[in-house]
Amino acid sequence: MTHLQFDNRLRAELPGDPEEGPRRREVLAAWSAVQPTPVAAPTLLAYSADVAQRLGLRAEDLASPRFAEVFGGNALYPGMQPWAVNYGGHQFGHWAGQLGDGRAISLGEAIGVDGGRYELQLKGAGPTPYSRGADGRAVLRSSIREFLCSEAMHYLGVPTTRALSLVGTGDAVVRDMFYDGHPRREPGAIVCRVAPSFIRFGNFELPAARGDVDLLRQWVDFTLARDFPDLPGSGEDRIASWLGQVCERTAVMVAHWMRVGFVHGVMNTDNMSILGLTIDYGPYGWVDDYDPDWTPNTTDAQGRRYRFGTQPQVAYWNLGRLAQALSPLFGDAAPLQAGLDQFRDTYLACDRRDTAAKLGLAECQDEDLHLIDDLRALMREAEMDMTLTFRGLVDLSPQQPDASVLREAFYDETKRAAQAPALGAWLQRYAARCLQDGASDAVRASRMRAANPRYVLRNYLAQQAIDQAEQGDLSGVHALLEVMQRPYDDQPRRESFAAKRPDWARDRAGCSMLSCSS
């Protein structure tokens, strides 16, 4: 028996749907009561020891068959009261109406050993009123990707939801991976993701779009009371301060994405966390050869709305939709604009901080922004790996700058040779700036190692682990989980996990481009 304690404030304090069960319907309330749909043979495949410890779960809890039953959707611990939340959102720039938790079911809000709140949410636990004709299930490949990325991002220092467990269901799920008329049966799985709150921008957009100001205000009052209890003031001033905090947190999150080369892939407003956490890991990816126009999402391949380089602008646009949703609570738009301005100010400050850290400098001067932009242009022209380039610069000697420290970063020898003179000139500029900074080589290297990861969850690494897991071998998943817990360290005998994308993975499904099929 676990010792988890729940208070489930969302269910207790926000209006619920009078109808229970998964029947698809328009819902005018904040949430709907719905039970997970049982599966054939729930089996624990992997778990996060850190998240389990925060929840107070013991080794015997995790080893118990009851744990797999609960987090596979077949049973409940005392105090759990499952629900799915109602929200809307803008998808690819267009209003999509009611969306909601189509295959996510929250089991409860647990109070951890640190006194913090940990909402436990099963993804792939069956249909809800918001499933929109889908089966509410998830396949093993997408579940592995969400489980691993949730944990990898945490250890990279990126604000994120976490993952407690990955449970195989024993059931097959039919999916058309690229929506091309070739569906296939795939093994099913369920991830338990964990966060203090899963409230999204879309929770406020939907009642605003419906003209339901009462429910909008209830959502705002609840969010302030539960998730932002220390905000001072009252009325419009407090709501404006809250929006400013959301804008700041979102800016910090996206700045971290840009620092480590992460591309979310589906930055719809229903995938934006009110806490500034990375949420909903679908067709995400890490930049391999540097390209600000790259997106991993096949659905976005033509318009490239959510490409790597535009993520800050998209985040700002999404915050504008949140501000618009809150506008019925304000007599004047000026406080809302002031909150939005905090995004730009915070993002620019984070960008300067990260520029200095990635280059190993004590502070970022204006010319350093040009220096790093010129490096990015070189990386693009020479087809250089982003992660390996910045990590390789750690070993550069400012006294004798030598491009050989970047030899592992190139994908194309012809392009390397063509850009060699320009790269050499840039290295001379960078070396001079390091000497001007005055820090020792050891201090500079320490700064850079803390900002430039050695290991990131490249798509091809995740796909290799998925291929093994689909054959019943979870060793690849466990190895990746272990390596990604120390992304900034040089790990002996783990060098293969730091290698750039191999040629075979350039165009392979799951390694370069992914769909939303999951």
UniProtKB/Swiss-Prot annotation:
Annotated Mg(2+) binding sites: N271, D280
Swiss-Prot/TrEMBL keywords: ATP-binding, Magnesium, Manganese, Metal-binding, Nucleotide-binding, Nucleotidyltransferase, Transferase
InterPro entries: SelO
Ranges for region Disordered: 1-22
Residues annotated for ATP binding in this entry: G100, G102, R103, K123, D135, G136, R193, R200, D280
Catalytic activity: L-seryl-[protein] + ATP = 3-O-(5'-adenylyl)-L-seryl-[protein] + diphosphate; L-threonyl-[protein] + ATP = 3-O-(5'-adenylyl)-L-threonyl-[protein] + diphosphate; L-tyrosyl-[protein] + ATP = O-(5'-adenylyl)-L-tyrosyl-[protein] + diphosphate; L-histidyl-[protein] + UTP = N(tele)-(5'-uridylyl)-L-histidyl-[protein] + diphosphate
Cofactor: Mg(2+); Mn(2+)
Molecular functions per Gene Ontology: AMPylase activity; ATP binding; magnesium ion binding
Active site per UniProt: D270
Enzyme Commission no: 2.7.7.-, 2.7.7.108
Top EC class for this record: transferase
Record family assignment: Belongs to the SELO family.
PANTHER family membership: PROTEIN ADENYLYLTRANSFERASE SELO, MITOCHONDRIAL
Function: Nucleotidyltransferase involved in the post-translational modification of proteins. It can catalyze the addition of adenosine monophosphate (AMP) or uridine monophosphate (UMP) to a protein, resulting in modifications known as AMPylation and UMPylation.
Protein name per Swiss-Prot or TrEMBL: Protein nucleotidyltransferase YdiU
Species per Swiss-Prot/TrEMBL record: Xanthomonas campestris pv. campestris (strain ATCC 33913 / DSM 3586 / NCPPB 528 / LMG 568 / P 25)
Source lineage: Bacteria, Pseudomonadati, Pseudomonadota, Gammaproteobacteria, Lysobacterales
Gene name tied to this protein: ydiU
